[in-house]
Amino acid sequence: MLNSAMSVVILAAGKGTRMYSDIPKVLHTLAGKPMVQHVIDAATKLGAAQVHLVYGHGGELLKQTLKDDKLNWVLQAEQLGTGHAMQKAAPFFSDDEDILMLYGDVPLISVETLQRLRDAKPQGGIGLLTVKLDDPSGYGRITRENGKVTGIVEHKDATDEQRQIQEINTGILIANGADLKRWLSKLTNNNAQGEYYITDIIALAYQEGREIAAVYPARISETDGVNNRLQLSRLERIYQAEQAEKLLLSGVMLRDPARFDLRGTLHCGMDVEIDANVIIEGYVTLGHRVKIGAGCIIKNSVIGDDCEISPYSVVEDAHLEAACTIGPFARLRPGAELLAGAHVGNFVEMKKARLGKGSKAGHLTYLGDAEIGDNVNIGAGTITCNYDGANKFKTVIGDDVFVGSDTQLVAPVTVGKGATIAAGTTVTRNVADNELVLSRVPQVHKQGWQRPVKKK
């Protein structure tokens, strides 16, 4: 069916006392981003014309964190219930648009479920998302008459017969803007809590003869809310299990799906293998036949075909061409670039540095602000000294250079093609092509040398 224009209201004003945190509840992260951002993303993908975010506790931190110019911020200074929150947003509703109500602490709601809810909303009626639970204790029950939804009864107000009902209210609903504003204006707070409940509009709509259509989510976990860290950790595992399942079914080999975390977006080629305890963050692309070892962290990086990242390496904002090998225990920081066949070994760190085709930095090395040519050997313990305490400077190393162990290159400095830097050298001046450079204290031999002994 053809959907009307739609705006979304996200309720995010609660403090989240049971989180025991100074951070607003909806800013606690799931899969690397705030819970409320998951909900905003779903609303955006659904095609919302406007997203109204109802906020209260920690509003300034919310604005600093989300930084979304498209959000309409609606202040609920005093939290007097879900109906009160919607009343605050109501002045922004257009009469001819549908309004979808979501929650900032229900992060797993899917676009597919919301689209089915949107499609099911009757003309002039309400679309309501409900679920059936084996143990519905504490939840508002959905009452029906001849199969039609007639209202929602809170658990504390329900009769013994009504408490046997397993269908409960999730709080997620959609209705026309004009109808919603009218029903919201009729809400009262004549209850023990002195709050305005959005659930009361169901009975108001039924009294007007409006149809209420109930829709079930694809998975019950989509409607699970978060009130404490235990619930958040459970949703994290549910989310990660779903992501792992999708990857496995698409051909990615996860050696232990229960110990894999995806905190962003991952694109994989054919025959990719990922070992246990790997974390993927941001936007990551893995080419064909890439192997990621145990305990690695890959963030916002492109890894070319046939690359192998050995265990416990960290790769962030880096670009690797085909057939590169990394680690174990290597760190590629932002701006690291490896050309085809390059190798970075254990305890090597790179930042804003390019390592040419077939070049190697095998052990215990720092390469920062450096441009290194093809077929270069960087010996163990080499350091590009790029910082003078105030400014950064660049080191340039040409093709086919051999850099011996324990070398310091004090930038700015250029080493020409084919040059050889002897072990233990400190390079402070440019080196010409094919030169040998060495700077060492002369080696002294003392025959019959006696070591000092401790005095008794």
From Swiss-Prot:
CDD domains: GT2_GlmU_N_bac, LbH_GlmU_C. InterPro entries: Bifunctional_GlmU, GlmU-like, GlmU_C_LbH, Hexapep, Hexapep_transf_CS, MobA-like_NTP_Trfase, Nucleotide-diphossugar_trans, Trimer_LpxA-like_sf. One of its GO terms (molecular function) is UDP-N-acetylglucosamine diphosphorylase activity. Residues 230-250 are annotated as: Linker. Its cofactor is Mg(2+). Pathway: Nucleotide-sugar biosynthesis; UDP-N-acetyl-alpha-D-glucosamine biosynthesis; N-acetyl-alpha-D-glucosamine 1-phosphate from alpha-D-glucosamine 6-phosphate (route II): step 2/2; Nucleotide-sugar biosynthesis; UDP-N-acetyl-alpha-D-glucosamine biosynthesis; UDP-N-acetyl-alpha-D-glucosamine from N-acetyl-alpha-D-glucosamine 1-phosphate: step 1/1; Bacterial outer membrane biogenesis; LPS lipid A biosynthesis. It holds the Pfam family NTP_transf_3. Signal peptide: none annotated. Mg(2+) binds at residues 105, 227. The active site is at 363 (proton acceptor). Residues 251-456 are annotated as: N-acetyltransferase. It is found in: Cytoplasm. One of its GO terms (cellular component) is cytoplasm. Keywords: Acyltransferase, Cell shape, Cell wall biogenesis/degradation, Cytoplasm, Magnesium, Metal-binding, Multifunctional enzyme, Nucleotidyltransferase, Peptidoglycan synthesis, Repeat, Transferase. Its EC number is 2.7.7.23, 2.3.1.157. It catalyses: alpha-D-glucosamine 1-phosphate + acetyl-CoA = N-acetyl-alpha-D-glucosamine 1-phosphate + CoA + H(+); N-acetyl-alpha-D-glucosamine 1-phosphate + UTP + H(+) = UDP-N-acetyl-alpha-D-glucosamine + diphosphate. Gene3D superfamilies: Hexapeptide repeat proteins (2.160.10.10), Spore Coat Polysaccharide Biosynthesis Protein SpsA, Chain A (3.90.550.10). PANTHER family: BIFUNCTIONAL PROTEIN GLMU (PTHR43584:SF3), NUCLEOTIDYL TRANSFERASE (PTHR43584). In the N-terminal section; belongs to the N-acetylglucosamine-1-phosphate uridyltransferase family. In the C-terminal section; belongs to the transferase hexapeptide repeat family. Homotrimer. This is Bifunctional protein GlmU.
